[in-house]
Amino acid sequence: MLDKLLEADAIGLRLEWVGGLPLWEAHPTYRHQKAVDRIRQSIRPKEGGCPCVHVADVYVRFPDGSYKRPDIAIFGREPEELDEAITLLPEAVVEVVNRGYKAKDLEIAPRFYLSQGVKDVVVFDPYTLLVLHLRPDGAFRHVSPVELDLACGCTLTV
């Protein structure tokens, strides 16, 4: 499956396989990438927290067999996989909304990540500055810039 996803990437499609269904979007814009880079630069561990290992736009294979490419995935330790999809479950994910793909980023992705056991899901819309922070126990709305504490012991600014 990963080979097919990488073939799609080679022709300019960002393809994911979620719950047995293919989802695609065009490659991200400069605005999107600037937001991802800014957020990644802000990720840091709180005292005694996890090491906050974070990667951008890398395939993660989830427990149900789905393949997704979170804009940012935050792990509690270094993943073992270097040349294939990561199978370690992220502690948290951040998705930055792409214009034209709001439904995927605001409705499909958060529900999916939480169903797979991700503890914190953050969705940022760089056009409206809306920040949604979703956890198994609730959802919280913020306006960027905002500093968020994650369950794993990391802090980030969105």
Positions of predicted regions on the chain:
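Gly/Pro/Ser/Thr-rich low-complexity, intrinsically disordered segments predominantly at protein N-termini
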Residues: 1-158
